[in-house]
C-alpha cells in the first residue's frame, strides 16, 4: 500500500501474474486510481485448476475479483487466447486485452546443444514440482519405459506455499524411484544442453518458458497439447504434441524419435541440428526478452498518448 500511495497520476504500473495483480488491486482499492495499470497474466494458475477446493474458491471470489480487476487495470495481457477468453468471461472485464505470447527468453547465456546421441537418449522434465505440471504422469511414463533405450531425469524443487505443491514425503518417494534420476535445481542455461528430449506434461500453462528455452538450445520437445504449448511452439521444428497427456502416446512419440531414420543412419546431428538452427532464428526474430520488451513499450507509448492506437503484432 505504501508503494501505491507514492504513485503519481501519470505513472504506468505493470504487474506480472494474476496473484500479484490481485494483491496490487486490493492495495489499490481505497485510493483514487489515476495511474495507468497493466496486468500480464502469465497463466491462470491454481484458482483455475481442476482442484475441487480451487473450484469452490473461484466461485466464492468471483464478485470480488470482477470488481478488483475492472477497477484497477486498463490493459490485460495474456499469453494465449484460451486464457484470454476464460478470464475475460469470468471477470466480466470491460477494458482492452491483447495477446503477447511469451515473456521472452534471454538467449545470450544459453549453451547450445552440439550433438545428439543415437542411443541412451536423456529425457528431462524441468519444472516446479506441483501436481498440475504432470509430475506423476511423468513418473508413470518413466516406470512404463524403464527397460527402454531412454534415461529419465527430473529437475525442479517443491513450491512451498503453493497448495498444489508436492509434499516432502512425495519428493522423498521420487528420490527413491529407480526409474527416475532426480536432479533438484539445475542451471538451465548451462546444463539443459546435456539432455536430448524435453517433456512438458503440464495440464495448464500461460506459455511454457522451458519449452522455448529447450527449442532454442536444441532439444527435441514433446508437449501435452494445451494452449500454453501449442499456440507458440507449433511454429517450431523438433516439436511434437500429445493429446490429453496420454502416457501411451508419449511412449509412442519417444519410440518414433529413436527409430527415426536420422538416428538409424547416424545423421541425427544434421537432421535435428538444422531444425534447431531454424528455431533459434525464429526466436531471435520474435521471442527474445528484448523483442517482447519492445512490444510492451508500444503499449506504454499508447497509454502515455504518444501514439494514437495500439494493435498487437502477435496473432
Model-derived features: positions:
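Short His-centered aromatic/hydrophobic patch
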Residues: 15-21, 41-42
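A conserved mid-protein helix/loop that constitutes part of the nucleotide-sugar donor-binding site
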Residues: 121, 130-144, 212
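Nucleotide-activated donor-binding/catalytic signature segment of Leloir-type glycosyltransferases, i.e.
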Residues: 166-185
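Short hydrophobic beta-strand element within catalytic cores of glycosyltransferases
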Residues: 220-223, 228
Amino acid at each position: 500500500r505504501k508503494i501505491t500511495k507514492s504513485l503519481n497520476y501519470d505513472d504506468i504500473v505493470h504487474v506480472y501474474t494474476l496473484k500479484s495483480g490481485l494483491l496490487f488491486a486490493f492495495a489499490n482499492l481505497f485510493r483514487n486510481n489515476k495511474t495507468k495499470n497493466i496486468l500480464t497474466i502469465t497463466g491462470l494458475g491454481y484458482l483455475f485448476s481442476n482442484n475441487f477446493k480451487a473450484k469452490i474458491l473461484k466461485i466464492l471470489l468471483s464478485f470480488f475479483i470482477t470488481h478488483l480487476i475492472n477497477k484497477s487495470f486498463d490493459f490485460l495481457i495474456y499469453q494465449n487466447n484460451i486464457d484470454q477468453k476464460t478470464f475475460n468471461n469470468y471477470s466480466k472485464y470491460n477494458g482492452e486485452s491483447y495477446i503477447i505470447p511469451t515473456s521472452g527468453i534471454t538467449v545470450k547465456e544459453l549453451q547450445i546443444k552440439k550433438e545428439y546421441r543415437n542411443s541412451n537418449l536423456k529425457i528431462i522434465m524441468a519444472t516446479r514440482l506441483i501436481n498440475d505440471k504432470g509430475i506423476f504422469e511423468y513418473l508413470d511414463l518413466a516406470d512404463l519405459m524403464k527397460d527402454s533405450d531412454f534415461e529419465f531425469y527430473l529437475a525442479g524443487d517443491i513450491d512451498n506455499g503453493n497448495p498444489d505443491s508436492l509434499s516432502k514425503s512425495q519428493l522423498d518417494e521420487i528420490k527413491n524411484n529407480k526409474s527416475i534420476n532426480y536432479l533438484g535445481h539445475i542451471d538451465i542455461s548451462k546444463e539443459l544442453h546435456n539432455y536430448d528430449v524435453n517433456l512438458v506434461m503440464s495440464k495448464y500453462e500461460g506459455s511454457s518458458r522451458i519449452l522455448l528455452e529447450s527449442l532454442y538450445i536444441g532439444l527435441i520437445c514433446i508437449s501435452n497439447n494445451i494452449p500454453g504449448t501449442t499456440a507458440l511452439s507449433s511454429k517450431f521444428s523438433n516439436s511434437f504434441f500429445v493429446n490429453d497427456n496420454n502416457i501411451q502416446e508419449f511412449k509412442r512419440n519417444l519410440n518414433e524419435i529413436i527409430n527415426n531414420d536420422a538416428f538409424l543412419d547416424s545423421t541425427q546431428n544434421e537432421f535435428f541440428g538444422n531444425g534447431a538452427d531454424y528455431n533459434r532464428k525464429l526466436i531471435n526474430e520474435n521471442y527474445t526478452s528484448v523483442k517482447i520488451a519492445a512490444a510492451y513499450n508500444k503499449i506504454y507509448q499508447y497509454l502515455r498518448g504518444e501514439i494514437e492506437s495500439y494493435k498487437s503484432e502477435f496473432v
